[in-house]
Design a protein with these regions (language model features):
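Nucleotide-state-sensitive switch-loop elements of NTP-binding domains
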Residues: 2-11, 18, 22-167
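A short, hydrophobic C-terminal helix/tail in secreted or cell-surface proteins
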Residues: 264-268
Length: 268
């Protein structure tokens, strides 16, 4: 293995049912000679997403190379499991790309922190190369955003609690490079405009790609070099507003008183 080898990682996030597994399957089916390793995380004891990938014919049931990170979340309880899998994938020149499908309840920022911390974990962690985060794609169900979140209006109201679904959806939109606006044909032009306006308000730096059934040009998602932790972490509108206040403080008055599945395209 050549020292200093770097392998790009695509992180796919999004709430349950948004289309993450559909996107993953389509990437694998259109790999065009790219050797992928895939890590799939499902919060339940049975990894439904991994089963769907197997059902799609990309892998066989009982394949020893199919390992799912399950019964936990890679943004918290399974962070070191994720590190160990990524480090293990760097052994041998077996693949060109790593795709991670996060659980629908995962917050993307802690996952990004975990991946980006691998180079600081000592020589053993990087002896075979370094997996680096290339891009975070959040898949958003346009119809659900329209029907359950008022075309996104409820996401811009900051009175929801930390454990509320709105908070999770907002975090997934705010901390990404690309928003894949899926099922777009199922909403009206008016709702589409409102949804895009909301997404842009939450994350002005994210590119919005409209699609149905996650049919996209995969060259827009792979080898993008889009991810920069500092820029992504400060792309959210509320953070930008705080930064503006710090840069331009108001006049001051004195007063008293936080699957692993390896696919070798050569076998096709």
């Amino acid at each position: 293995m050549e020292k200093g080898r770097r392998v790009p990682v695509l992180l796919i996030t999004g709430y349950l049912g948004s289309g993450k597994t559909t996107l993953l399957n389509k990437i694998l089916n259109n790999r065009k000679g790219v050797r992928f390793a895939v890590i799939v995380n499902d919060i339940g004891e049975v990894n439904i997403d991994a089963d769907l990938i197997a059902k799609d014919g990309l892998i066989g049931q009982g394949d020893d190379s199919l390992v799912a990170l399950q019964n936990g979340c890679i943004c918290c309880t399974l962070q070191m499991d994720l590190v160990n899998q990524l480090v293990g994938l760097m052994e041998g020149d077996r693949f060109d790309y790593i795709v991670i499908e996060a659980s629908g309840i995962c917050e993307p920022e802690p996952i990004a922190q975990t991946i980006c911390s691998i180079p600081t974990m000592g020589p053993a962690a990087v002896r075979n190369g370094i997996p680096y985060l290339d891009c975070i794609v959040t898949v958003v169900d346009a119809l659900r955003l329209q029907s359950e979140f008022g075309s996104g209006k409820s996401l811009t109201v900051k009175n929801y609690g930390e454990e509320d679904l709105e908070n999770l959806v907002v975090q997934q939109i705010e901390f990404c490079n690309i928003v894949l606006l899926n099922k777009i044909s199922e909403v009206s032009e008016e709702d589409r405009a409102m949804i895009k306006e909301t997404i842009h308000a939450l994350n002005p730096g994210a590119e919005i790609i409209e699609c149905n059934y996650c049919d996209v040009d995969f060259s827009e998602l792979l080898v993008t070099h889009r991810f920069d932790f500092g820029k992504t972490a400060t792309s959210a509108t509320w953070i930008r507003e705080i930064e503006k206040e710090i840069e331009c403080p108001p006049p001051h008055n004195h007063h008293d008183g936080g699957l692993l599945y390896t696919s070798d395209a050569a076998d096709e």
